[in-house]
């Protein structure tokens, strides 16, 4: 027989910029193994948020939705699922927390997920992200951006970072980390997609 070629291509980035051992221990403090995002409030568009034990489900009804969260942390044994109308649907999650969002468990979505926290986003070694596409940033967008689908990331004054030490897989979309400091020591795969690490 002959070797069957796969049509999907992927990129794997392994950039060793900073040892995890150098991170202050306080960065990882305060998130339990079953921690889930809190205070989800839909600001534009339509979605329902429900929780079942250590799993949080977001059922998105509109093509684009904006959700404001008090905190957006996912513990090591916790899962957040976004069920979206299609692969190009966008869920914009804006986080009000004074601390960085810590993603230590599973984040799943069939569409595009924006995770915006001016104080940073950190994917730990145990993070497993499997989405259509993901944007993690310390910048922000407006409700009108979400409605129009034309996103202009607005600058924030915080000198925070987006850091990945885990596994991030995007099936056909963009993986974009945008912050004053971007660190990737984990694995990023964008099947038929694009990877942007922008500081």
Per-range role (PLM):
Residues 1-9:
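N-terminal secretory signal peptides that target proteins for export/translocation
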Residues 3, 13, 18, 22-199:
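Solvent-exposed adhesion/ligand-recognition segments of exported proteins
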